[in-house]
Every structure is written in C-alpha cells, then in structure tokens.
Amino acid sequence: MLYYFLWFLYSCIGAVFFNTALGQPKFGAFGYLLGFVCTFLLHHKFPSLFFGDNNADFSHIRGAKIVSNSKLLALSKKEKHVENPVTIANIAVPFALENRHFLFVGSPGTGKSQLFLQVAKVARQRGNGAVIADLDGELTADFYREGLDVLLSPFDKRSPAWSPLAEMEGVWDADRVAKSIIADGEGSSKEWNKYAQFILSAVLLKIWQSGGNNGDLVHYLMFSKNEDLKALCDGSEASRMFEDGAERMLSSILSIVSSFAKTLNKLDKNANADSFSITKFVKENAEKNTGKWLFMPVRDDMFPMLSPLIAAQVDIAISALLTSKNDDQRRVFFFVDEFATWGKIEGIEPLLTKARKKGGCAVLGLQNVSQARENYGKERSQTLLSSCGTWLTLRSTDGDTAEFLSRNIGDEDIRRVINSSSDQGSSTSEQFSKQRVILPSELQKLPDLEGVLNIAGPLPAGWVSIKYMQPERNVEPFDLKDERSIEKFLDEEEQESVEIETDGFIP
C-alpha cells in the first residue's frame, strides 16, 4: 500500500514540476496532466530511480517488533509510574510490573553489573528491603550500612554468628532447612539427594531439640561413626538407610551429605538456635518495612567454598518472605547475579512464581542458558526464565544463548511488495513471511552497554543504551578475619574435595 501511495505522490510532484517548468499560463491543466503521465511512466519503467534497486515495500502485520530507544521512551512516559520508579537504561518500569521480576542476560563485561547497581540505587532511595548474594562484594561496597544492615560471611569480622539451627521454630522446619542445604537433584541424582536430605533433616532435628550447636551438627554429619549417626537418626525417615545390607548405599549417601555439610564446617562452632536468624530478619523487614538489607558477599577465590552456603541462605530468605503477610505494594528485592553459578537455589522457582503477592522482586543475572539447564534441568530452567517479566538482552557470544534470546524476543509476520522491471515491462508481487525480529548473529555483535529491553505488558521491545554509573565504594566489601586461617580453610577445602572424589565417605 505504501508503495502505490508513493508512486501516486511522486507522479503528482512531477506534474507540478513539469507544468511549472513549461509555464502554467501556456499549457494550463494540460501541463499538469502531461507532467503526471510522464512521471508515472518514468517511475513504471525505471522504479530504481525513485526507490533504489531493491524496490520493496515492507510492512509489519503482527507479532513482535523492536522500536527505537526514543520511541520506547515516549511510550513508557505514557504509562503511570510511581514517584521514583525502577528505570532500566532510562526506561521506567511500571510499579505493578516490578514484582514480575527482572532478568539481565549477557556475556561478562556487557553491563549486567551496571544494571544491578542502578536498580539497587532506586531500591535504597525508596527504602525498600533487599537480600543480596554479592559476587566480589560490589553492591556491599556501595550500599552496606554498618549498624543497620546485616552482612553474613563466616570470614568477615562484621558478620554475626549464624547457624541453620536458628532457622527452626518447630519440628516441621527440619525438612525445609535440610532442603535448603541439600537441594533436590536433577536426573540420576534426584533420589540420592532425597536420601541425603532425610539424614540431614534427622540430624538437624535432634541437635535442635537437644540444644546443640554448629559443632555438634558438623560432628555428626562429617566425623561421627556410623553407629553413632544411626542412633541419632533412630525413629526418623533416615533410619532405613542404616539397615543391614545397605552399607554401600549408605556410604554413597553419606558422601553426598558430607559434600554439602563441609560448608557448615566454616561456620562458628558455638552458633546455635539463639544466633542470628535469616528467617526472623527477612519477615520483620518485610512486614514492618524497615528497609534493611542482608548482604552475603563472596570473594572470587572463596566462591567454590562458600557458594553452597550462600545458596542455602538465599533459599532460607526466600522461604521467610513466602511465609510473611501478603502485601503486593511493598518491595523486597532479591539480587542474585549469575544465579545459575551458585548451584541450585531451591527457592528461586517459588520466588518467581509465588512471591508477587508478598512484594518480592527478583533481579537475576545470567551469562548463558547452559548453566541454568545444568543446575535446574531443561524444562525447569525454561520455567524460571519465562517467569521473569522484564528482560534486558545484552551481547551474548555463546551461540546457544544467542539463539535462545533471539527466539525469546520473538518473530514477526511481514508483507513485502516487490516491484521489478526490465525491457519487457514491469511487475508487482506480494510475499508474506515470518522472520526473527533480531538474529542470533546480531546479538553476538552488540556493543557493551547496549541491548534490547522487553518489559511485560503492552510496551514493545526496544533498543536501549545503558548510561554508565560510577560506583561509590563507600565501605570495604571484605573485612576479613585472620588471613592465615582463611588460607587454611581454602587448603582444607581442596584436600576434602580430593578425598571425596578418590576415597568416598570415611566415617
């Protein structure tokens, strides 16, 4: 349709020009007619003079589309926003869509950390609560307030003592805490992890009931004789694991228990049920809108050792929010960059699918989809990613991830009007086809700090550029205890890993 309109328009312009050049008083209406006909025929014979060699009229029929940054900004301003909305690359996200969660996908160095910084700044300005699994302590350095916020790390001087026993209020909590520490397995490990959860749950319950501490917990999970552990688990679901003839199975199960429990060996041995409680902190923070933040920073060299512990603590924080009173007008942000590298966080799925009425807002970062599939399985990882309402797609050099992101942005149905001409005459044809709005190869070549923003709701996807924000670095992200003891822990971690791989569990 556009093609024919332009054809007619050019012919009219030609008519005016032709008649003016010849002199309107002399030719009158005939001059206009002659100019129109000549221009019409010239366009028909040589259309490339007007539209170029690839003469085609493209029109979007339906499906996805990507608009310019200025267009997306104009459309966003028409939406209703709170006084200080979360903005992604200068595009305001409607308040009602914040608890549909955020996902930032891109290779290292593309701008994900900047996005976390900018969302966190809005959360702090508004007085929202937050839970942060903090790689390299970047958000801790900018936002931690000593005396108000809480920093959890077994190696940091500012951290309170913590124990999983402090997360239990009744016998019903043993299974939940055990599942936070030993997440459900995928594939062949599913049943084995379940058996390991039975043993951990039984030990947690008995130690909690007897008023024990982390030292007791670690002793039974890692160093006690099988006979002592059997006596402790007597009467629980785990007791069947200790039956005669099940020695080989028990050895395998205890290896799993030990591999997860060794991170508890880094905790204060004297911490117990009266120590700092993540559950109480998060519930009070949510229900009273205290605006306090919980930081769990980790240095890169400590990540393999502490990531299972932090994953368990994040899971416990999620469970706490989900048991708080409903209030979809409050906001409690969960910042988990590179969420697929922490191991499996069991509570991520309920956070994304159930926390909206609690005011929970997940802000997740991801490098490539293979990491998510490895830890959560193909189908469940798809559920997790599709549960995020606001996506920002940055450069992704991984081919599988670029393909996944291209499909996620979507396809569009288009109509092409193609015009061709030759000495024999000219012809016009129409073609209807479906194509990707953006190709994987285009996503692989995006510059740093540029990408495609897709917000749930009526707004189309749009091109955006992230304005760099200089981090403030108000405090040191790590104020470590005796460095020599930390090095000792790191050496022990490596040695324990070798023993588990070569010898299995040794009671």
Language-model segments: residues:
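Conserved H-loop
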Residues: 135, 367-371
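Short regulatory helix/loop adjacent to the ATP-binding pocket of P-loop NTPases
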Residues: 143-146, 372-386
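Preference for solvent-exposed, low-hydrophobicity sequence contexts
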Residues: 405-406, 423-427
